[in-house]
Amino acid sequence: MEIGVSVAECKSVPGITSTPHSKDHSSPFYSPSHNGLLTDHHESLDNDVAREIQYLDEVLEANCCDSSVDGTYNGISSPEPGAAILVSSLGSPAHSATKVEPIEKASGRQLPPHIELSRSPSDSMAEGERANGHSTDQPQDMLGNSLQAPASPSSSTSSHCSSRDGEFTLTTLKKEAKFELRAFHEDKKPSKLFEEDEHEKEQFCIRKVRPSEEMIELEKERRELIRSQAVKKNPGIAAKWWNPPQKKTIEEQLDEEHLESHRKYKERKEKRAQQEQLQLQQQQQQQLQQLQQLQQQQQQQLSTSQLCTAPAAHEHLDSIEHTKEDVVTEQIDFSAARKQFQQMENSRQTLAKGQSTPRLFSIKPFYKPLGSINSDKPPTILRPATIGGTVEDSSTQAAKEQKALCVSESQSAGAGTGNAATQGKEGPYSEPSKRGPLSKLWAEDGEFTSARAVLTVVKDEDHGILDQFSRSVNVSLTQEELDSGLDELSVRSQDTTVLETLSNDFSMDNISDSGASNETPNALQENSLADFSLPQTPQTDNPSEGREGVSKSFSDHGFYSPSSTLGDSPSVDDPLEYQAGLLVQNAIQQAIAEQVDKAEVHTSKEGSEQQEPGAMVEEAGSQAPGSEKPQGMFAPPQVSSPVQEKRDVLPKILPGEDKTLREKGPSQPPTAVQPSGPVNMKETRPEGGYFSKYSEAAELRSTASLLATQESDVMVGPFKLRSRKQRTLSMIEEEIRAAQEREEELKRQRQVRQSTPSPRAQNAPSLPSRTTCYKTAPGKIEKVKPPPSPTTEGPSLQPDLAPEEAAGAQRPKNLMQTLMEDYETHKSKRRERMDDSSVLEATRVNRRKSALALRWEAGIYANQEEEDNE
């Protein structure tokens, strides 16, 4: 309140000074400023009062400029000092008025504020000297009224008020002055105390803002001080500061001996860089050449052979499609095309191991079954069929389904077109070449799709194994699907060899499971299946339980499909694998629908069989090939129609029933598998070899399958290519998972089949070995569970096979012994352990070479299994 009033009074001062009653006005003006109350004391203005006012004036002058500029920083308004000045010049009102203005100017007060203040006092006076006198809004005209009102000679009243207020004002001002001058106002007050002196003000400003040069000097001094102090405490610092160490080159620092090696190292590094650049350039050139070749080949194929594709393929390729007869009648040079595509794929992969490892290792299981299917048929028949619409259909549909799983339909159309264009061996291969990146992606992803794509494409060429089997068995189909599939599988196998990631192992396992699943349908289809089931690991694991092996492989197959479709398998752990599972689900659904819709169309063509394997591979990855193989075996010449029928059945069974088959599958597959069980065992051993790539246990089985020298050789090759480190790492993980799954499976089996303890015991041992095969594939360990349950049933049906398989499982321990010796020893051991809860443990030990894995599993699983048996 005081602030506002004082300001108003100060502004009103000029008007007051002009009037003759300046004294009176000053006194009332003061009274409102402090109390705003007029007391009825009729005392005239005293000399003491005048002195006090003068003193106040001085104090205000000292603070006036600051307060006015600060906007009454301390509650004292700048006008009040002005008023004080006016009072001091009681004798000469005019002089006081003039003085006030100069002060205002000196203080740097702005006129507008001054006007506002005058308004407020005038307003307060006009209203009867309102207590606040804070109405700044009143027009300036009120100033005259305010002057007149105070002009009334109420000098006594106003004089007394002024005296009283003077005292109060004095006290207040003193306090405020002290407050104003306090140190914490340093920023504002010191510079403004003497604002009247412009020079001083400028000096203050200069002091406040130091010039850059001065700041630089100060900073230098500060740093010097710091350094001098630091050097005293730590003299070593001085050397660094004052004599900064000069950087020495590596050559100067090294001794002569080291220097020489360093130079050599640099040279090697440079050479490497140059070589890498050259390699990159060469690779790029090769890729360009390959692309050109592919384009040329595709163009030639398109021109030579009209596109003849399955209904799905036709949808995408209607524009290119011409006549199916052309494709069938014109036989493309599949071998040459396939070779070209293989070369291209290998160069793309740029893997040190190249195709040999992938062939031996990734394609064996599946492709052997594929070859066996075709083997049932005369290879010549299959070739023409494959070359004809059949191959094209299979490749196109497979491509389409694969793409449906992994890629958009447009891509599938492109792949289908490539397949149709390349038709026959080349068609499938061109598809892989086209799909080359896709296959690689799938393989890298460790997706089930990759395995499926591989199955579909690998039909034609097995690279290592399939070539061996497919040459005699199914050249065209095997080559065709194997070509594209081979590349993907080889990529996968190489990845597995490198053991870059579990996902790779998983994908490899998926592939192996695919082979197993292929075997399972073959086993289901009986002896003809046995021929195809040669590569199937599951039955190799449980040769004694041919049915179990089949059911296992089937369940594995189902496992693979469900795991991919439903994300049950451990491979789902990887997001990529989970995505693969989703893709598989879509592929299975599409494949089932296409199978149902196109079964009739495909039955007319052998290509339908290929399509089905492609579709099935896409759906369940391995199941489709399995189903296809069995049918091929049943009606070798009529592979297409049987495959369609079987395919229609299997796709439906794969997702839902395969799981059931895993758990209860033995009942269904075992019957069909029983006849094929023994044969499957032999053929399965090769697949065991295929699995051996994944785990030594599988390798042992493959050795046991030395009976099938072809497969065993193939197995040995890829196995040798694999490094022990990778094997042990993947084996340990696989064995751990497999052991856990085995435990669960054994528990389930014991609970379900406690009624038949002895057969169960037999099954359990064979199961572990078999499970081992599956579990050797890290990705498939969990999937192995369902096969064991079928295995338990299987052993009763095929107890003889179990001993054989046991021998195969033991193979790792006694690789140098004869198969017969090992078989006998293992058989006797198994019989001894049949009723013992430690049977499973023994089997596990037999199949494993990894000491760590053996110890770990022996301790945990032996104890747990014993408890379960109890």
Curated annotation (Swiss-Prot):
Residues 259-274, 313-324, 595-608, 644-665 have a biased composition (Basic and acidic residues). It is found in: Apical cell membrane. GO terms for biological process: actin filament organization; cell surface receptor protein serine/threonine kinase signaling pathway; protein localization. Residues 14-43, 103-165, 233-324, 409-436, 506-577, 595-688, 740-814 are annotated as: Disordered. Residues 576-589 are annotated as: PKA-RII subunit binding domain. Keywords: Cell membrane, Coiled coil, Glycoprotein, GPI-anchor, Isopeptide bond, Lipoprotein, Membrane, Phosphoprotein, Ubl conjugation. There is a cross-link at K174 (Glycyl lysine isopeptide (Lys-Gly) (interchain with G-Cter in SUMO1)). Residues 133-151, 506-543, 755-774 have a biased composition (Polar residues). Its main location: membrane. Residues 152-161, 275-302, 410-424 have a biased composition (Low complexity). InterPro entries: AKAP2_C. It is a lipid-anchor; GPI-like-anchor. Residues 213-307, 720-755 form a coiled coil. There is a cross-link at K174 (Glycyl lysine isopeptide (Lys-Gly) (interchain with G-Cter in SUMO2)). GO terms for molecular function: protein domain specific binding; protein kinase A binding; protein-containing complex binding. The keyword Oxidoreductase does not apply. The modification Phosphoserine is found at S122, S152, S347, S472, S476, S528, S641, S730, S758, S789, S796. The modification Phosphothreonine is found at T537. One of its GO terms (cellular component) is side of membrane. Binds to regulatory subunit (RII) of protein kinase A. May be involved in establishing polarity in signaling systems or in integrating PKA-RII isoforms with downstream effectors to capture, amplify and focus diffuse, trans-cellular signals carried by cAMP. Binds to and modulates the structure of the actin cytoskeleton. The RII-alpha binding site, predicted to form an amphipathic helix, could participate in protein-protein interactions with a complementary surface on the R-subunit dimer. This is A-kinase anchor protein 2.
